[in-house]
């Protein structure tokens, strides 16, 4: 039974020979391979700006900073500086099938493994475009304009998902973190809206 079949049978509760797993860096113990599109419209690599500080711009235009050369960093300046920017901001174009060549290559190189592609979704993209504190404030103060932004992010995600599937992905993983250990970051009533 191939890794791809093991994962499929796990998902379908169809008597797999074992539990599917993914221990990164240990090829004999891995059923998954990961890949993503090659769109890098506004992205720059990390650049050292002083002795301990590094900065980069992601493909959305957000400026990131990190301490040392090994931390993940955080957004220090979102691409959107004003709420009305939601109407004019140009998202990276994830609709071009040619940008999904890395996914097709992964499928060709690993035909017997489960090809998983992770993408950021509404909250992850939106909170970085404004920075988290400003984003949460805009959810309360400018709900209709935030719906405009969320619809645009969702359209971009739809393009990604469609192209990932056409390029050979078996699954698309979306991880959103709307909460702390014991509660939502926003009022539950706002969440429902």
What is the predicted role of each segment?
Residues 1-28, 66, 88-193:
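Active-site loop segments of alpha/beta catalytic cores
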Residues 13, 23, 44, 58, ...:
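Cofactor-binding catalytic cores of oxidoreductases
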Residues 17, 23-45:
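Segments that shape or occlude catalytic/ligand-binding pockets
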Residues 29-35, 51-53, 76, 125-128:
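Short, solvent-exposed polar/charged micro-motifs at secondary-structure junctions
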Residues 38-44, 75-76, 83-85, 134-138, ...:
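Short, low-complexity, polar/charged sequence segments that are solvent-exposed and flexible
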Residues 39-57:
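Short acidic, Pro/Gly- and aromatic-enriched capping/linker segments at domain boundaries
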Residues 66-89:
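Short, surface-exposed, low-complexity cationic segments
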């Amino acid at each position: 039974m191939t890794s791809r079949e093991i994962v499929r049978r796990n998902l379908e509760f169809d008597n797999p020979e074992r539990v599917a797993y993914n221990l990164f860096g240990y090829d004999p113990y891995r059923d998954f391979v990961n890949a993503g599109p090659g769109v890098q419209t506004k992205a720059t690599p990390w650049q050292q700006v002083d002795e301990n500080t590094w900065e980069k711009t992601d493909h959305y235009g957000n400026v990131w900073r990190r301490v040392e050369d090994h931390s993940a960093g955080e957004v220090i300046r979102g691409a959107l500086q004003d709420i009305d920017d939601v109407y004019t901001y140009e998202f990276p174009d994830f609709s071009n099938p040619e940008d999904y060549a890395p996914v097709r290559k992964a499928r060709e190189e690993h035909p017997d493994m489960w090809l998983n592609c992770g993408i950021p979704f509404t909250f992850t993209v939106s909170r970085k475009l404004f920075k988290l504190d400003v984003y949460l404030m805009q959810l309360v103060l400018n709900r209709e304009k935030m719906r405009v932004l969320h619809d645009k992010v969702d359209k971009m995600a739809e393009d990604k998902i469609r192209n990932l599937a056409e390029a050979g992905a078996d699954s698309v993983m979306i991880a959103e973190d709307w909460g702390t250990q014991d509660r939502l970051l926003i009022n539950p009533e706002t969440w429902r809206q």
